[in-house]
């Protein structure tokens, strides 16, 4: 990474900055601390990309700043916080693709192209051939979890993938055994496990993670690492005074302050280790001033405010379409039925509130009711998540959208 933060590298992902190199789809409504990106996006996009090839480094430059991105050499370690349904499906998928058992369907980096020059030039190389990204063969997985099950056992328990596929990958998946997790049931009420770290305070737990990360990197001979939070949704939290500065944040860790959640401890450990951090849950995590300052100080990129793979993804597709046609919205009702561990966690009102806040804010952010009050002011937006064990991991989602068009005539969309 460059020695000083570069806007394109250190900024969290935003819907206002096209970024073809993102590996993971994430929620498109950033928290308030990220929203200044909109004001700065034009400035960021001034930086042209020069001297780029599969084997050479990026050079991003303007008159004042130059930043280098080294080519992807050596192994890339992907450290996953949580080894449940999401992580094991991700790991098994990569292992299956590496062995020619499956195709990388849904992967932007592996299947999508990037246009060079004019459309008529017909220059559309695959992103993976144009950008110096790590090859799938160079990816190594590690994880933390509150349960000691290997990736194979966890995948079998989750029941997302077919047993026949998992049987073909069993040797690789059995090798991935989770390290003891940083966990506190106060933040995830419906779960408890035995594979948990102990420490006198939260700073000591962070120091254990930092040492563990360094040892894991050495043992697996990785050139670089990235950390992804793929664990359960924590209880709803607001920004606290201890989050304002790095000094107050670190003191709060030593004091075992309740405003420091486990996800923040992981993010802190990653950033102190110079490791990029992606948040795949709607938790208040890296998006606090103290951790954003640490990321900037160490020139480490961060991103994420929940994975975007289901109902919220559909909203971010449909809502811009309604807005583009200047169609009004009376209301949007969404419900989910799921019976997996995620559903069990979200059955707790405090964890559900974290998810609900994230899901509710996405429409307001896209539709801008303050700009178009006659179309979007005071629309009703209801989100329900129902835990129903017989459904298992086969989540079901329903949406009813009440819109109005020419002369105010009402219409309905059902998904």
Segments predicted by a language model, with ranges:
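Short, positively charged and aromatic/hydrophobic N-terminal segments
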Residues: 23-40, 44-51
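Short linear segments in intrinsically disordered or otherwise low-structure-confidence regions
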Residues: 6, 17, 37-38
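Active-site-lining helix/loop region of Rossmann-like oxidoreductase modules
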Residues: 77, 81, 293, 300, ...
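Metallocofactor- and cofactor-centric catalytic cores in central/energy metabolism, strongly enriched
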Residues: 58-281, 285-297, 311-319, 412-415
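Short catalytic-loop micro-motif centered on adjacent basic/acidic residues
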Residues: 277-281, 302-306, 330
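Ala/Thr-enriched low-complexity intrinsically disordered regions
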Residues: 11, 22, 42-43, 57
């Amino acid at each position: 990474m460059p020695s000083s933060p570069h806007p394109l590298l250190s900024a969290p992902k935003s819907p206002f900055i096209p970024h073809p190199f993102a590996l993971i789809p994430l929620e498109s409504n950033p928290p308030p601390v990220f929203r200044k990106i909109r004001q700065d996006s034009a400035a960021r996009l001034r930086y042209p990309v020069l001297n780029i090839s599969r084997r050479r480094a990026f050079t991003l430059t303007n008159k004042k700043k130059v930043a280098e991105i080294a080519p992807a050499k050596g192994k890339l370690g992907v450290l996953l916080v949580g080894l449940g349904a999401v992580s094991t499906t991700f790991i098994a998928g990569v292992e299956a693709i590496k062995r020619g058992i499956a195709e990388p369907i849904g992967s932007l980096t592996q299947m999508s192209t990037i246009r060079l020059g004019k459309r008529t030039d017909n220059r559309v190389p695959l992103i993976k051939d144009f950008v110096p990204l790590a090859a799938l063969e160079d990816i190594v997985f590690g994880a933390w979890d509150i349960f000691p099950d290997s990736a194979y056992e966890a995948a079998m328990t989750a029941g997302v993938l077919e047993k026949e596929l998992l049987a073909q990958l069993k040797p690789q998946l059995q090798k991935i055994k989770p390290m003891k997790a940083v966990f506190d049931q106060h933040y995830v009420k419906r779960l408890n496990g035995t594979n948990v770290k102990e420490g006198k305070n939260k700073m000591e737990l962070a120091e254990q993670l930092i040492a563990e990360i360094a040892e894991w990197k050495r043992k697996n001979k990785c050139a670089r690492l990235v950390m992804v939070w793929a664990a359960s949704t924590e209880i709803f939290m607001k920004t606290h005074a201890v989050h304002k500065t790095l000094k107050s944040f670190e003191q709060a860790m030593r004091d075992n302050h309740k405003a420091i959640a486990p996800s923040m401890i992981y993010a802190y450990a990653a950033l102190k280790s110079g490791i990029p951090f992606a948040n795949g849950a709607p938790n208040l995590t890296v998006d606090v001033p103290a951790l954003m300052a640490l990321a900037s100080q160490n020139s480490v990129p961060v991103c994420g405010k929940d994975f975007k793979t289901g109902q919220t993804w559909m909203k971010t597709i449909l809502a811009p379409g309604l807005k583009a046609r200047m169609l009004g919205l009376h209301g949007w009702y969404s419900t989910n039925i799921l019976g997996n561990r995620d559903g069990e966690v979200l059955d707790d009102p405090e964890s559900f509130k974290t998810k609900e806040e994230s899901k509710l804010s996405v429409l307001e952010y896209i539709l801008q009711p303050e700009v178009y009050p006659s179309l979007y002011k005071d629309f009703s937006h209801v989100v329900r998540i129902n835990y129903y064990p017989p459904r298992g991991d086969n989540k079901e989602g329903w949406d009813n959208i009440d819109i109005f068009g020419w002369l105010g005539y009402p219409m309905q969309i059902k998904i």
